[in-house]
Curated annotation (Swiss-Prot):
Function field: This protein is one of the early assembly proteins of the 50S ribosomal subunit, although it is not seen to bind rRNA by itself. It is important during the early stages of 50S assembly.
Keyword field: Ribonucleoprotein, Ribosomal protein
Disulfide bonds listed in the record: none
Homology family: Belongs to the universal ribosomal protein uL13 family.
Positions of the UniProt region annotated as Disordered: 129-153
Protein name: Large ribosomal subunit protein uL13
PANTHER family: LARGE RIBOSOMAL SUBUNIT PROTEIN UL13M, RIBOSOMAL PROTEIN L13
Assembly information from the UniProt record: Part of the 50S ribosomal subunit.
GO CC annotations, alphabetized: cytosolic large ribosomal subunit
Pfam families in the record: Ribosomal_L13
Amino acid sequence: MKTTSLKPADVDKKWVVIDAEGLVVGRLASIVAMRLRGKHKAAYTPHVDCGDHVIVINADKVKFTGRKYDQKVYYHHTGYPGGIKERSAKFILEGRFPERVVEKAVERMLPRGPLFRQILGHLRVYKGSEHPHEAQQPQALDVGSLNRKNVSA
């Protein structure tokens, strides 16, 4: 049996839309990261960008399990001494850009490497139910039905 190694020209990229309403952030991000890398395909090749384009809608309606909504803290550093900043998940989700919670979760599940920025460029996250990618005819992926733990009660 011969091992298949995809060439960039042979990759068939699909468009997938995921409705994130009521889904658990970490479980959603794990599935999205797998789709972006292309690991759901039989002909996955690590050094080729063979993943799909993923659109996540209703990113402002994601859920956290336990008390993470109030207690989870996101850190970033300004680059200056003593410049560590922190924001809670609640602060971000109730702010102007709630989709950043999903973006950061997916970004941190992808491996840093030569393809990182290219793969991350195939992710589109929107806070409402509207998206401007109808022309690509994305297929709907029901993440909630894949596992009952994906949906928060």
